[in-house]
Amino acid sequence: MIFVGLAKFRKKPDKKDVGDTTKIIEEWKAKGINMLNWYWTLGSFDAVVVFEAESEKEAMKMSIEISDWVTTETLVAIPREEAVKLVK
């Protein structure tokens, strides 16, 4: 499944946070969560992450793990090609 995560930093990130994030991404990859794209953004959210996970439960586990650093809103994403097939 593909997800879009919207995140707001709880505090100003520093170099240690960036290094910790790199390590955590590798740990998630070993658990089957694959980061497809990651952007720092301007506006209501500080970051947007597009990732794959096996299920909603796995995506929720990831959100819980990072809740000390960021608040998140996670969306389930359906590729356009698949969504168009649902239109009658």
Predicted regions and their residues:
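Short S/T/G/P-rich N-terminal loop/turn motif that feeds into the first structured element of a domain
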Residues: 1-30, 34-36, 41-45, 78-88
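Short beta-strand-to-loop capping motifs
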Residues: 7-9, 49-54
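General N-terminal targeting signals
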Residues: 20-22, 26, 50-52, 68
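An amphipathic, aromatic/His-enriched active-site/gating alpha helix that lines ligand/cofactor pockets
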Residues: 52-83
